[in-house]
């Protein structure tokens, strides 16, 4: 059997863009014949998938699945909204989230478990696909809400199903960062306080007066970034805390995921640039 050298692995990586372990495996199976390895990788879609891996995947879907008091929220990305609605893509996402909620696996474990399936899907669809993140929420009472494919929310707490569902809808729309005003970390409060003091002083207020003014502003700030402090979207004259009290309900935790959060999308290519790229070949 021919020896698979580091130089061969390096060359195959450069020619296909695939990962080191994938290249080594392909060379072993091809008895160190690099041309055969490339041919086999092309057939399996591995080479194509590797080339697509550099493409920004900022579209996709948030999938939610509940099982035995645990809900999994999964983000799977693709490159276009069209593929996000493709049945092959959605079937893949459903398969991954089912495995996630059954085992509460980390995203790294899910990525490893479904890598071969992902590579095959990339080859079939022609876009980069990425299992980006997964989060779990546990509780005796869970309510979930999806706004299209793009936003997913799960709320854990106590109360009737309708109330918790409405709270989940509120979270989707209002993007709170914490459950209660008291949950806002001290460093976040101090940072915002410093900003507000500076704003007040820039308005011509002496520092002592500025700091007193900021006390009211900070109460408003912690209310705006926390669920229970926000005005309820369905009854804006009441806070979420007041609604929960009226309904005899409470919220202990929530997770809100939105497709593409934090992903920098590539600038869209103009028609002229597209033509130039085609001419370059």
From Swiss-Prot:
It comes from the Bacteria. The keyword Nucleotide-binding does not apply. It is found in: Cytoplasm. Pfam families: EF_TS. GO terms for molecular function: translation elongation factor activity. GO terms for cellular component: cytoplasm. InterPro entries: EF-Ts_dimer_sf, Transl_elong_EFTs/EF1B, Transl_elong_EFTs/EF1B_dimer, Transl_elong_Ts_CS, UBA-like_sf. Keywords: Cytoplasm, Elongation factor, Protein biosynthesis. Gene3D superfamilies: 1.10.286.20, DNA helicase RuvA subunit, C-terminal domain, Elongation factor Ts, dimerisation domain. Residues 80-83 are annotated as: Involved in Mg(2+) ion dislocation from EF-Tu. The keyword Cytoplasm applies. PANTHER family: ELONGATION FACTOR TS (PTHR11741), ELONGATION FACTOR TS, MITOCHONDRIAL (PTHR11741:SF0). Associates with the EF-Tu.GDP complex and induces the exchange of GDP to GTP. It remains bound to the aminoacyl-tRNA.EF-Tu.GTP complex up to the GTP hydrolysis stage on the ribosome. Belongs to the EF-Ts family. This is Elongation factor Ts. It comes from Aliivibrio fischeri (strain ATCC 700601 / ES114) (Vibrio fischeri).
């Amino acid at each position: 059997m021919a020896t698979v050298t580091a130089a061969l692995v390096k060359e195959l990586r450069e020619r296909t863009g695939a990962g080191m372990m994938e290249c080594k495996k392909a060379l072993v199976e091809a008895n160190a014949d690099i041309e055969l390895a490339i041919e086999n990788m092309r057939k399996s879609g591995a080479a194509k998938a590797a080339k697509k891996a550099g493409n920004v995947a900022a579209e996709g879907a948030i999938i939610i699945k509940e099982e035995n008091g645990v809900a999994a929220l999964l983000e799977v990305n693709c490159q276009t909204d069209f593929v996000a609605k493709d049945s092959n893509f959605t079937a893949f996402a459903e398969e991954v989230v089912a495995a996630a909620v059954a085992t509460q696996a980390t995203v790294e474990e899910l990525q490893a478990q479904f890598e071969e399936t992902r590579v095959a899907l990339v080859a079939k669809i022609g876009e980069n696909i990425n299992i980006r993140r997964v989060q779990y929420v546990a509780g005796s009472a869970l309510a979930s809400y999806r706004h299209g494919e793009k936003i997913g929310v799960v709320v854990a707490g106590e109360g009737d199903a309708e109330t918790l569902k409405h709270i989940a809808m509120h979270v989707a729309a209002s993007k709170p960062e914490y459950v209660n005003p008291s949950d806002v970390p001290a460093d976040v409060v101090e940072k915002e306080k410093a900003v507000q003091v500076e704003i007040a002083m820039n308005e011509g207020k002496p520092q002592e007066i500025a700091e007193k003014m900021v006390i009211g502003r900070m109460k408003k700030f912690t209310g705006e970034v926390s669920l229970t402090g926000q005005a309820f979207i369905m009854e804006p004259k009441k806070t979420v805390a007041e609604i929960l009290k009226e309904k005899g309900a409470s919220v202990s935790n929530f997770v809100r995921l939105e497709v593409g959060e934090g992903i920098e999308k590539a600038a869209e290519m103009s028609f002229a640039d597209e033509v130039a790229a085609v001419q370059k070949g």
